[in-house]
């Protein structure tokens, strides 16, 4: 079978409520091909120091990915090492997925807390 182009769609959901008061994610939509790398960004609610990342594949419930608090990774879900992230001094966070696979097509969400 010849090479087949697989599209990988990544959707992000913005926080509800006024933009300045909620969690914000960017980009809101992302389409990549298999093998590429994707980066998602999350800005927490002002004053929040913890950021949580979740994945929701089509037809499945939310799956926990990563938890960062005050710049440290505090917990990690059962995902391959190609899923990584970091938290910056301003408490915003980044989720990176390397060597994308078709099964990575999902809704990715971030949340924040004190």
Curated annotation (Swiss-Prot):
V region of the variable domain of T cell receptor (TR) beta chain that participates in the antigen recognition. Alpha-beta T cell receptors are antigen specific receptors which are essential to the immune response and are present on the cell surface of T lymphocytes. Recognize peptide-major histocompatibility (MH) (pMH) complexes that are displayed by antigen presenting cells (APC), a prerequisite for efficient T cell adaptive immunity against pathogens. The keyword Signal applies. This is T cell receptor beta variable 5-8. The keyword ATP-binding does not apply. Residues 22-114 form the Ig-like domain. InterPro entries: Ig-like_dom (IPR007110), Ig-like_dom_sf (IPR036179), Ig-like_fold (IPR013783), Ig_V-set (IPR013106), TCR_beta_variable (IPR050413). Alpha-beta TR is a heterodimer composed of an alpha and beta chain; disulfide-linked. The alpha-beta TR is associated with the transmembrane signaling CD3 coreceptor proteins to form the TR-CD3 (TcR or TCR). The assembly of alpha-beta TR heterodimers with CD3 occurs in the endoplasmic reticulum where a single alpha-beta TR heterodimer associates with one CD3D-CD3E heterodimer, one CD3G-CD3E heterodimer and one CD247 homodimer forming a stable octameric structure. CD3D-CD3E and CD3G-CD3E heterodimers preferentially associate with TR alpha and TR beta chains, respectively. Keywords: Adaptive immunity, Cell membrane, Disulfide bond, Glycoprotein, Immunity, Immunoglobulin domain, Membrane, Receptor, Signal, T cell receptor. It comes from Homo sapiens. Disulfide bonds join 42-110. GO terms for biological process: adaptive immune response; cell surface receptor signaling pathway. It is found in: Cell membrane. It holds the Pfam family V-set. Gene3D superfamilies: Immunoglobulins (2.60.40.10). Residues 1-21 form the signal peptide. One of its GO terms (cellular component) is plasma membrane. Coiled coil: none annotated. It comes from the Eukaryota. SMART domains: IGv (SM00406). Glycans are attached at residue 90.
């Amino acid at each position: 079978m010849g090479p087949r182009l697989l599209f990988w769609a990544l959707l992000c959901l913005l926080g509800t409520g006024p933009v300045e008061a909620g969690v914000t994610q960017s980009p809101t939509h992302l389409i990549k091909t298999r093998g590429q790398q994707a980066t998602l960004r999350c800005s927490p609610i002002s004053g929040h120091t913890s950021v949580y990342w979740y994945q929701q594949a089509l037809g499945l419930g939310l799956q926990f990915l990563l938890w960062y608090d005050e710049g440290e990774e505090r917990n990690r879900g059962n995902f391959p090492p190609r899923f990584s992230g970091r938290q910056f001094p301003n408490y915003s966070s980044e989720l990176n997925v390397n060597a994308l696979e078709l099964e990575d097509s999902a809704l990715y969400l971030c949340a924040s807390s004190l």
